[in-house]
Regions:
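Gly/Gly-Pro- and Ser/Thr-rich, intrinsically disordered tail segments characteristic of DNA damage-repair
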Residues: 2-111, 116
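Generic hydrophobic-segment detector
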Residues: 4, 41-42, 152-154, 166
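Alpha-helical architecture
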Residues: 50, 162-163
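Phosphate/anion-contacting hairpin/loop surfaces
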Residues: 63-161, 167-168, 172-174, 182-186
Length: 191
């Protein structure tokens, strides 16, 4: 998702949104009408990421975009007709179309005019593993008195986001912690 964010940011940040085209009004959840109603004319302040969510921050609110399992964005500079799984377009003032394609429709588009960090799908997420909030002490505190195996514990997005199977296996190997060891039995120096 970070790679997608970095690829899209130069095309969106600082741009004014000319129009939104929603071809399929229901992805994982219904696309909120405010998304298409509030975004035209808005200026994109930033395209950020929180866990697997892209946060399209504008001067009118924030669109929360999730790729699901099969979603992707493409940047188009022509009037290419949409393909069968092209569900929505974000068209900028300079004529660039950012098109969302999702064959399985597990992706989602949400809208908030509040702080996106307070959104019910974002608020309970743990810290980013490379962020300042994620420390050995934090992980040790969150692991205390937990009988669940350490590997699924550190793969839980409410504990820390972005740790998948491979990263969990590698981190535990380097820390010399067996993956089935109870999370609460790992000593602080190992974290």
């Amino acid at each position: 998702v970070e790679i997608t964010r970095r690829g899209l940011a130069p095309w969106l940040e600082g741009q004014r949104i000319a129009r939104i085209v929603v071809r399929v009004p229901k992805l994982r959840w219904p696309v909120p009408p405010e998304f298409a109603r509030r975004l035209p004319g808005a200026r994109v302040a930033a395209l950020d990421r929180r866990a697997k969510w892209l946060l399209l921050r504008t001067d009118r609110g924030t669109a929360l975009l999730h790729l699901g399992m099969t979603g992707s964005f493409r940047v188009l500079r022509d009037d290419r007709p949409p393909a069968v799984h092209d569900h929505l377009d974000i068209v900028t003032g300079d004529g660039v179309t950012v098109r969302f394609n999702d064959p399985r429709r597990f992706g989602s588009v949400l809208w908030t005019e509040d702080d996106p960090a307070l959104h019910p799908l974002i608020a309970p997420l743990g810290p980013e593993p490379l962020g300042d909030d994620f420390t050995a002490g934090y992980l040790h505190r969150r692991s205390r008195r937990r009988s669940v195996a350490i590997k699924p514990h550190i793969m839980n997005a409410h504990i820390v986001v972005g740790v998948g199977n491979i990263y969990a296996s590698e981190a535990l190997f380097r820390a010399r912690i067996h993956p089935v060891r109870a999370a609460g039995r790992a000593a602080l120096p190992r974290f």
